[in-house]
Amino acid sequence: MRVAYVDPFSGASGDMLLGALVDAGVPPEELADRLASALDVDGYRLVVERVVRRGLAGTQVRVIVEAAQPARDWAEIRDLLSASALPPRVKERALAVFRRLAEAEASVHSVPLESVHFHEVGAVDSIVDVVGVVWGFELLGVEEITCGPLPLSRGWVETAHGRLPVPAPATALLLAQAGAPLVPLDIEAELVTPTGAALLVELARFVRPAFLPERVGYGFGTRELPWPNALRLWIGEAFAVPSRLDEAELLLEANLDDMNPQFIEPLVDQLFAAGALDVYLTPIVMKRSRPAVIVSAICRAKDRPVLERVLFEHSTTFGVRGIPIERTKLARRSVAVATRWGEVAVKLKIVQDRIVDAVPEYRDCLAIHQRTGLPIREIWNEAARLAAVWIGQRVGEEDQEATLPE
């Protein structure tokens, strides 16, 4: 799956995201042509520049407005986008971004949603930024967008409502609603704009993904800062990483000195059914010379609650010990051999890509013994002889799931 990771180390705005997308591979001429043909707006042009700021190179995209633009309200922007020739997914996501922003503005200024005037973000430049960013991710084939922590700056910003604190109230509400992670940055400047916040909150999840990076783009803003005023965008392929909980294993133990031994077999069966990787019994002598048994179950850490419940419900114990363990596990394969009396599964033991042993499965041999009455030793020996042809063969990592030659 193709993913994008937004690293807003110096903030986020619509033009910074658009610049990062172009820097990461979106063809600017193609994007400009698509926007011009799909949107019923004019009086603007896209200017794309390669810039170097504070020693870092990237792309700056500016929407140059060449004619006066109205301060559109939410209803006007909704109608404009709904009537556009945008692809359905781009249209839907762009509308969702503006609706989210309109709801935030309505909330912080206590006005009805339909009467929200965007002022700063209602002009054509913000419409082009929002639609361009949504379409840019589509052009790169991105299926999932994630975002890192955003900088929390201070100061004031001049708006149509007057002088307001940074982050602007709508920006602050958007970030709070999304639970976006914030990192304090001691500078008087608006680093995260309402448009940038709405785009990230609507399109992205605030997590760090596991992915194989293919390209990196930098999109620059217009403000001069003591560091590169840029947003970094990673594009790559996602891959699954097992969590620590999935990998961790435990040894659960309980001492039983007052339980009918006949009840231990069903207890062991229940532990295996609940997900135990292995279960074994150890005879011990407890206080007052009582004979007892330790029931030990190896399990994945995530399965601990289920196995503990089995031990408490199906044994007489009042307590269970949990001990973290580490195991070194060899690669193994399971194949089948055809004996004269039926198939027997065989486990192949692999060390450094070489098969070093082939062990018939006892249960299969037992089933044939019970059906035929033959000595189980004879059945096991024939299966082992047939399986011996694999011993010594090499198995490459890429062939672990392939069928070995017979």
Swiss-Prot record:
Keywords: Nickel. The keyword Glycoprotein does not apply. GO terms for molecular function: lyase activity; nickel cation binding. InterPro entries: Ni_insertion. The keyword Cell cycle does not apply. Signal peptide: none annotated. It comes from the Bacteria. Coiled coil: none annotated. Belongs to the LarC family. NCBIfam families: nickel pincer cofactor biosynthesis protein LarC (TIGR00299). This is Putative nickel insertion protein. It comes from Thermomicrobium roseum (strain ATCC 27502 / DSM 5159 / P-2). The lineage of its organism: Bacteria, Pseudomonadati, Thermomicrobiota, Thermomicrobia, Thermomicrobiales.
